[in-house]
Amino acid sequence: MNKKRFVAFTMTAMMGLSLFAGCSDNTKKENGNNSTTSTEQETTNNPSASTTDNAYGLRDNTKDGAILHCFAWSFKTITESMEDIAMAGFSTIQTSPVNACYDGGDAGMELFGAGKWYYHYQPTDWKIGNYQLGTKEEFKEMCETAHKYGIKVLVDVAPNHTTKVTEAISEDLINAVGGLDKLYHSKGMNAIGNYNDRTECTLQGVGGLYDVNTEDPNFQNYYIEYLNDVIACGADGFRYDTAKHIGLPDDPQDNPSLPNNFWERVTTEVTNADKLFMYGECLQDGGERLADYIDVIGATTASSYGQFMRGAISTSSMLADTVTNLRIGQAAPNVVTWIESHDNYTGDDKTYQALDNDKVVRAWSILAAREVGTPLFFARPYGATAENMWGTFNKIGMAGDNLYKDPIVVASNRFRNAMVGLKENVFNPEDTQNVLFIERGTKGLYIFNNSKSAYEMNLATNLENGTYVDRVGGNSYTVADGKITGSIAGKQIVILYNDGYVDLSAPATVKVQDGTQGNFIGDSTTVTLVADNATKATYSIDGGEEVEFKNGDTITIGENLDFSEMTTVTLRGENAAGNKTCISYIFKKQDPIKEGTKIYFVKPDGWADRVCAYVYDESSSSEVQVNASWPGVEMTIEADGTYCYTFTEEWINPLVIFTDGSNQSNGAMEPGAAVIADKIYEVE
């Protein structure tokens, strides 16, 4: 494998929901390029949609609001962030998988490196709690806290597969299905070769993992018991990872006596089935049968729409007809939309490089303003950049970047919450294709000028006559005699509405100074603290006493830590209205690998005699540090037959892959092992 970096691949599948309701008013103004859409259900008893469901303006139904994907956040972190999430206008959170999972890589807690975020998606059992996210009790507390704020909880589930390390599968699961051989389809350990072949797509393994026999009633019973436990703890729905790899009723059967009834059972035989919000991940890269999965689950993802939006936001054009096209063919428009998913971010799409934060925010605002679809916002790792996709801390369990609290994201979410039940009218003015208008009934108007030049408005609108405040910039715009006038600067977003506006004070911000690194070398490190719009700000270390601080104060941490130990700094703040914010940072005291350090490798039977060590570090630098181009540096053979590699310079956070050119020590597309001085490595 000739590659310098090893990007994790994971599947993500989403499961059904029953989506959007909209008004049936067919009147529209002729404003040039016009695309009016409505969903399959109609709402006629809510002409203003001015009443939201709680003090934060959040919606009681997940389908009506916006979802925040708390990617690799721990249950405790989500609990502490709940008021931040509510203030940002998200009505629903989505967790990473909460089931027991594979603890490879020495159970490391880095997103990528000495730890692997995608072990979330390698189940070893279907019971609540894992080493990455937290305990069942912490999950239950998280759900209870969410409900206090009016926030719903979606849980990512992955019943399609398990880890390929069968020794890690729990005895309870093996016994429940009658033996390990009965856990998988007959060819479940074979990789899919043709995704358009439904036999392969539904009965063979995806992403190097083993395909579970989801038609087996013993497995179904065990899995449904897990779902009901998750629901009892407070979950309000599920996202089904790799949904298109679980058979539909008319798909090929592995065992003629076992019908493809998985979807029927998990959508009807769970507690509160009619109240759950569920959707399935059906990536549009072959064999997806989108309409059929929407029919049996309730809703799916719309990955091709996200791909289009990522391209569109990078141009100046923003055609209404293309923006409203969900790219799902004739399927019902019951979809979860996104600008990027965690697969787009971590996989071949490399959206961390293709889209900067400004583009993510602007594109998101369009999804949130629309009536059709339920938008999901992926929370990128904290401090992530195009040069450093895993961020400045690279830790599983930490909250993601503060981008989900960006003022445009917040304004767009609150607009969405206020406009529930109002039909969308999406159009371009006659004189430009670079400006997008989204009217919501007669009560709200979203405008995005995607060009670099200002746009002077003087055009007809369905918006009622009156003066409207732009909830992004604060300026006022007037509608008189059915026309709106005013100027919109290049790349500016304007969100106009009065009815349903929830007036919340600006939140406090507490954080560490931008650029602060989570891993440090030396006896200690000094951290600069930031507090903005906070009447009170405190820090605590590892759950200790809270100490007040002011903007710019510094603290020193790490003096009493051993190398590789971690410490958590928690910052709390409060604004004048009493709204609270909280964020925790996980720091690790790093022991550098010094020049002259040796590591060893036991060559497996069947490998060639020439073995190389490929060492790399991509944890924080703008460029990946490597010891040599692939396959690395040839190792020397010791007297006892083990292979040895000696470091010729100091490294901060290196990983290593051993290879003979045809075989390698880590799995395909998995990161290397953390380097530990004098360790003897063996292939698992």
Labelled PLM ranges:
Residues 50, 61-65, 101-144, 177-211:
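Aromatic- and acidic-residue-enriched carbohydrate-binding clefts of CAZyme catalytic domains
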Residues 131-167, 227:
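Substrate-binding cleft of carbohydrate-active enzyme catalytic domains
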